[in-house]
């Protein structure tokens, strides 16, 4: 009789369990996302099923029915080596946890991260998570044949997502005001997620920091603000400078200790510079001057072929003066790198004159600007005859960088005057010489993702160059 009562109670309890709770009970480390709460993961007819899955110590991988029992046996264009994918995922996990310290173990809930492999020829690569509980990514075969930096990038997004989850575990309110779950304007967008995920992926694939596509875009767009939407996949160089000077934990601290409404660089200022804006611009100019020759330890094995590529455009405005082009004008926190043809000279003097926002462009400057989500030719549809008339008191930092034939760099002192002249004795064996100008307005300017270049804070200027032999 007692046994019957126990069996009846057990059956009653089982009858009240949802598919999610049954699956979680049967599969330790599995958390069933709320959006799939009604799905039976133990049913092979479900879109996602343990009948079509594989797992490693820290990841669960599910694939759609089109792959059948094993994606490795699919048609060549859909074939995926799931063992390789999981092995690489474990390495990317270790990079983010053990080296970058993006999350503490155990992760929220102690659950495994989840990978969902879609049966589609389209390019699908999205990383984030579910329910402020687990990291998850959704991918297609084209992104993992074999698994590489794309998967590292998306797992980087998972750990960005998890910074907020761990803040909640530590008692933070669930108000999307930590872990950069917030944007800097009404559209709730910020470029940090993509910039950061690129840098995180290059930790596993450092040689890919220099690729033709990324570098072509970078050399055209580097003058933009640090979190500009148009360089959201290329503006990762700042994090090399940051972590080289302050350690790898500086990157994860910015994510994990962010506070609304700060952007990443305001968080950096608070954590490391006591909110001193001048100290920030000093650090930023140091970064810009080093970025001109990619003078970062991690970049050293790969940078030689990319020297001498910066080429800011200027237009003559009379009496030897040249005015920076609209398309090369440094935005707030961005920089311009002007190559100087130093042949036969041993000293250069540059007269500098800062201009007000809204000043007239040079006559020959076409004044075209981008309107749209990306800086592509079809989006170059705006036209203006003035620099952007934003409400920002302008400021600058500027100086010289010499790159010698043996790879040595020589840096001048930095100047911050609105108008003045600076000189530099050109070292022997100088191969490339640059005049570098940083946009450093008197008050910090948060960059808003608005898909309209004409709204960006520009710091225009003009220069006159004189040589002595």
Say what each PLM segment does:
Residues 93-102, 157-164, 202-206, 243-248, ...:
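Sec-exported extracytoplasmic/periplasmic mature domains
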Residues 136-212, 216:
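Zinc-dependent metallopeptidase catalytic helix centered on the HExxH motif
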Residues 262-469:
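Beta/coil-rich, acidic/histidine-enriched accessory regions frequently appended to metallopeptidases
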């Amino acid at each position: 009789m007692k046994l019957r009562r126990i069996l009846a109670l057990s059956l009653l309890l089982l009858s009240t369990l949802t598919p999610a709770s049954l699956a979680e009970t049967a599969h330790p480390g599995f958390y069933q996302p709320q959006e799939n709460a009604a799905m039976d993961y133990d049913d092979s007819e479900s879109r996602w099923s343990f009948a079509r899955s594989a797992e490693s110590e820290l990841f669960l991988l599910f694939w759609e029915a089109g792959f059948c029992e094993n994606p490795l046996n699919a048609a060549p264009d859909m074939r995926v080596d799931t063992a390789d994918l999981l092995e690489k995922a474990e390495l990317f996990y270790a990079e983010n946890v053990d080296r970058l310290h993006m999350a503490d173990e155990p992760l929220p809930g102690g659950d495994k991260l989840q990978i969902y492999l879609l049966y589609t020829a389209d390019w699908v690569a999205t990383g984030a998570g579910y329910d402020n509980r687990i990291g998850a990514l959704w991918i297609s075969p084209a992104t993992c044949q074999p698994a590489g930096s794309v998967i590292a990038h998306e797992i980087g997004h998972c750990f960005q997502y998890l910074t907020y989850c761990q803040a909640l575990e530590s008692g933070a309110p669930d108000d999307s005001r930590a872990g950069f779950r917030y944007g800097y304007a009404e559209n709730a967008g910020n470029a940090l997620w993509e910039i950061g995920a690129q840098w995180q992926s290059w930790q596993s694939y450092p040689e890919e920091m220099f690729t033709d596509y990324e570098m072509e875009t970078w050399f055209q767009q580097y003058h933009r603000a640090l979190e500009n939407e148009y360089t959201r996949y290329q503006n990762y160089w700042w994090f090399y400078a940051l972590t080289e000077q302050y350690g790898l934990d500086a990157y994860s601290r910015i994510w994990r200790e962010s506070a609304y409404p700060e952007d990443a660089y305001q968080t950096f200022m608070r954590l490391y510079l006591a909110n001193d804006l001048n100290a920030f611009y000093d650090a930023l100019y140091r970064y810009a001057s080093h970025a001109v020759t990619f003078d970062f330890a991690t970049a050293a094995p790969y940078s030689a072929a990319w020297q001498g590529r910066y080429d800011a455009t200027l237009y003559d405005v009379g009496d030897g003066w040249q005015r920076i082009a609209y398309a090369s004008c440094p935005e707030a926190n961005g920089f311009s790198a002007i190559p100087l043809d130093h042949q036969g000279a041993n000293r250069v003097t540059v007269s500098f004159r800062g201009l007000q926002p809204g000043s007239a462009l040079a006559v020959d400057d076409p004044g075209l600007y981008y309107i749209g989500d990306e800086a592509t030719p079809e989006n170059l549809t705006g036209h203006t005859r003035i620099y952007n008339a934003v409400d920002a008191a302008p400021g600058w930092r500027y100086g010289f960088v010499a790159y010698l034939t043996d790879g040595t760099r020589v840096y001048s002192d930095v100047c911050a005057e609105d108008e003045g002249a600076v000189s530099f004795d050109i070292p022997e064996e100088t191969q490339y010489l640059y005049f570098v100008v940083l946009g450093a307005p008197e008050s910090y300017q948060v960059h808003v993702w608005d898909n309209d270049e004409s709204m960006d804070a520009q710091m225009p200027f003009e220069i006159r160059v004189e040589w002595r032999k």
